C-alpha cells in the first residue's frame, strides 16, 4: 500500500508537494504520485508563450480525508490548495487528479 512516485523536482512541483503536505498530512501513509506531464503538451495552444516547464501535472493520492466525499468535492479540496499556482500566468495549466480513500485504493489493488 505504500507507494511513492515523483517525476519532477522543479519549483512548481515543490510548491504543489508543500501545499498537499499541509492539506493532507496523512498522504505519506498511503500511495502518492506527483508527475510532471508537461513534456506531453509542448506546442499545445493553451501553453504557447508560457516559459515554464511545469504546466501539466498529474496527482495520484490516497487520503482518509476523502472518506464520505464525492469526486467533485475531493477535486475542490485539491484545487483550493493550489488555486494560487493555477491563477498565475505561468503556473499550472492542467491538473489531472486521481483521489481515493484507503479503502478504495485497497479494493482496486486486489
UniProtKB/Swiss-Prot annotation:
<dbReference type="GO" id="GO:0051604">
    <property type="term" value="P:protein maturation"/>
</dbReference>
<dbReference type="InterPro" id="IPR036065">
    <property type="entry name" value="BolA-like_sf"/>
</dbReference>
<dbReference type="GO" id="GO:0006879">
    <property type="term" value="P:intracellular iron ion homeostasis"/>
</dbReference>
<dbReference type="GO" id="GO:0044572">
    <property type="term" value="P:[4Fe-4S] cluster assembly"/>
</dbReference>
<dbReference type="GO" id="GO:1990229">
    <property type="term" value="C:iron-sulfur cluster assembly complex"/>
</dbReference>
<dbReference type="GO" id="GO:0005759">
    <property type="term" value="C:mitochondrial matrix"/>
</dbReference>
<dbReference type="GO" id="GO:0005739">
    <property type="term" value="C:mitochondrion"/>
</dbReference>
<comment type="subunit">
    <text>Interacts with GRX5.</text>
</comment>
<comment type="function">
    <text>Acts as a mitochondrial iron-sulfur (Fe-S) cluster assembly factor that facilitates [4Fe-4S] cluster insertion into a subset of mitochondrial proteins such as lipoyl synthase (LS) and succinate dehydrogenase (SDH). Required during the last step of iron-sulfur protein assembly when the iron-sulfur cluster is inserted into the target protein. Probably acts together with the monothiol glutaredoxin GRX5, earlier than BOL3 and NFU1 in the [4Fe-4S] cluster insertion process. Not required for [2Fe-2S] cluster insertion into mitochondrial proteins.</text>
</comment>
<dbReference type="Pfam" id="PF01722">
    <property type="entry name" value="BolA"/>
</dbReference>
<comment type="similarity">
    <text>Belongs to the BolA/IbaG family.</text>
</comment>
<dbReference type="InterPro" id="IPR002634">
    <property type="entry name" value="BolA"/>
</dbReference>
<dbReference type="GO" id="GO:0016226">
    <property type="term" value="P:iron-sulfur cluster assembly"/>
</dbReference>
<protein>
    <recommendedName>
        <fullName>BolA-like protein 1</fullName>
    </recommendedName>
</protein>
<keyword id="KW-0496">Mitochondrion</keyword>
